[in-house]
Amino acid sequence: MALPWLQRVELLLFTAAFLCGALAAATLTRTQGSFGGNCPLYGVAALNGSSLALLGPSAPSLCYFVAGASGILALYCLLLLFFWVYSSCIEDSHRGSIGLRIALAISATAIFLILVSACILRFGTNSFCNSIISLNLTISCSEAQKTSWTPSGTAVQFYSNLHTAETSSWVNLILWCLALLLQAMQCKFKATSYQPQERGDQEWSSETDALVGHHQSHS
């Protein structure tokens, strides 16, 4: 059974959301790993001779939250895609009003989590970069990732990875907002499609009562 066109567009959005969420989670995890498991967001850099070092990292749970939220939502998108592909090929692909309400609640929660994660990435990266630039060793974060860090091998492409994670999160936010809009439209269409049926049932009931009453009066 073919899926409605609105739901097909919704699944395309979730496909893109899966890619964005997975990319954000992977790049942030890679950045945290390059700092030895420390979270550079809102961190403080310091000079160690002629090298840079992460002196005051944030709690690792901050990066875990951002990467975890992005990863879990990406996994949800992937499972949702598998479910609807299976349903459209094997079973009935109809989604009822209760399913739509649940989808709306999940989308609203996802939008909140992604918005919080994107803001953490934006302001956390800016705070860390400002602490680096204030040392007057480099003029930008993109240049700082080319500078030597202590310990050796630390901060490999950290700014590029953080920038990619942030951009992916903002794009992911837009995709989820569009998905929420499509789900709301499906709820509206489903509600309006029930009204003519209910009106028709009432007319049928009235006609039936009239016929029954007419038959009883003759008998």
From Swiss-Prot:
Its main location: membrane. The chain crosses the membrane at residues 9-29, 65-85, 98-118, 162-182. The modification Phosphoserine is found at residue 206. It is found in: Membrane. GO terms for cellular component: membrane; nuclear speck; nucleolus. The keyword Phosphoprotein applies. It is a multi-pass membrane protein. It comes from the Eukaryota. This is Transmembrane protein 179B. It comes from Mus musculus. The lineage of its organism: Eukaryota, Metazoa, Chordata, Craniata, Vertebrata.
